[in-house]
Each structure stands twice: as C-alpha cells, then as structure tokens.
From Swiss-Prot:
SUPFAM superfamilies cross-referenced by the UniProt entry: Periplasmic binding protein-like II
Catalysed conversion reaction: 1-(5-phospho-beta-D-ribosyl)-ATP + diphosphate = 5-phospho-alpha-D-ribose 1-diphosphate + ATP
The protein's Enzyme Commission number: 2.4.2.17
Entry function: Catalyzes the condensation of ATP and 5-phosphoribose 1-diphosphate to form N'-(5'-phosphoribosyl)-ATP (PR-ATP). Has a crucial role in the pathway because the rate of histidine biosynthesis seems to be controlled primarily by regulation of HisG enzymatic activity.
Domains: entry comment: Lacks the C-terminal regulatory region which is replaced by HisZ.
Name of the protein described by the UniProt record: ATP phosphoribosyltransferase
Compartments reported by the entry: Cytoplasm
Gene3D superfamilies per record: Periplasmic binding protein-like II
Subunit comment: Heteromultimer composed of HisG and HisZ subunits.
GO terms of biological process kind: L-histidine biosynthetic process
Family: Belongs to the ATP phosphoribosyltransferase family. Short subfamily.
GO cellular component, one term: cytoplasm
Length: 214
C-alpha cells in the first residue's frame, strides 16, 4: 500500500476556501474539520489525510516533513523563509493585502515611527527598502489596539475589507503587497513520491483555474 500523503491546512478562511478545491479533486474530509477536535482528519481517499495546524505553522510542518504539502498565505511563506519548500501554485484564495495602517494623518513627524506587527521580517524589509528607520514591536494579534493605547504609531497587518481599521479610527496608508494563498510542497516528498504528489499538484492547479473561470 502506498504511503499516505499529508496536507497541512489552517482553520478559518483558508480551510473554507481550500475544501471546494479539494472536492474538485475528488477529496472530501471524513468529518467537518471546523467541528472536529481532531488535528489529523482522514478523507474519502485512504492515501490522503488532512493536518489541522496554526496558519503560521503550516510552512514549518511542510519544511520539516510533518506534512507533504500545505496551503499557506504568501505573507506567512515570506515571513517564514526556508529552503525546504517549493511553492508551485498560487491557488488564488483568501485574497487580501498586507498594509501599513495607522491614524489617517499618518505617524507623528520628526521621529522614528513605532510599528506593531506580527510580520516582523516583512515590516523591517519594507521600511528598509524605503530608507526609513522604524522600531518594530512584535505582536500576535489585535494590532489595531496598539495605536489606540499609544504603544505604536503604525501597524503592519493584513487588510481585507478595512472595516476593522475604520471601526478603530485607523486607515490604510501604504500597500506592501497583495496576498493570496499558495500550495507549498516539501521538496524531499516530491522526490520520493513524484508521481502522486505531481498529480495532486496538477489537480489542485486545475481546480484553482476552474474556480477563477466559473
């Protein structure tokens, strides 16, 4: 019997938008991942299972062989880095923008801005590319709170509709990059199971194209 392929996914929007693509490939979870407490979920195919992990951990599980492939946002992949990853397909799901945001008038002039974000590497890279010095403050959530309590002048975060920013008196100021979710593959797994993984990669790419044209 062939080895089971493991696909790492995170709960939330990525999972919600990946499941229809898997269904187009003939892969259905054996139970609802959102309702289940299980972290490893079988599918209707004996050779494919799902691994439910935190979004920021998807590339780590794939890089270190805990999963053969996964779905992660471009933001997570760029922040993570890593040489053991191959990202052959932009699935075009969970689209949003990585933005600099803050008070509508911008940061106070004449001093180095304090920037709250969980994307420390990408934020530092963005400001350095503009020749701007910034103090980066690492947070894991509720970025919008930092300017409200005077802890930061700006935030770098993912923005979809912008409703949360507006509700907290903030505005998008600069777009760093558009974001969508990509299929990411363990390079070693691709060498040991090229036919099976290659077929699944091609099927998911075709499903993503079909979604865009439907």
């Amino acid at each position: 019997m062939s080895r089971t392929l493991t696909l790492a996914l995170s709960k939330g929007r990525i999972l919600e938008e990946t499941l229809p693509l898997l269904a187009r490939c003939g892969i259905e979870p054996a139970e609802d991942p959102d309702a289940s407490r299980k972290l490893i979920i079988g599918t209707n195919r004996e050779d494919v299972r799902l691994l439910v992990v935190r979004a920021s951990d998807v590339p780590t599980y794939v890089e270190h062989g805990g999963a053969d492939l996964g779905v992660a946002g471009r933001d997570v992949l760029l922040e993570h880095g890593g040489d053991g990853l191959y990202d052959p397909v932009d699935l075009g799901i969970a689209r949003c923008r990585l933005m600099v945001a803050g008070p509508p008038d911008g940061p106070p002039p004449g001093r180095r801005p304090r920037v709250a974000t969980k994307f420390v590497h990408l934020a530092r890279q963005h400001f350095a590319a503009q020749g701007r010095q910034a103090e980066i403050i690492k947070l894991y959530g509720s970025m919008e709170l930092a300017p409200l309590v005077g802890m930061a002048d700006l935030i770098v975060d993912l923005v979809d509709t912008g409703n949360t920013l507006r509700a907290n008196g903030l505005a998008p100021l600069e777009e760093i990059m558009p974001i969508s979710s990509r299929l990411v593959v363990n390079k070693a797994s691709l060498k040991t199971s090229p036919d099976r993984l290659g077929t699944l990669i091609d099927d998911l790419a075709a499903a993503a194209r079909a979604k865009d044209t439907s």
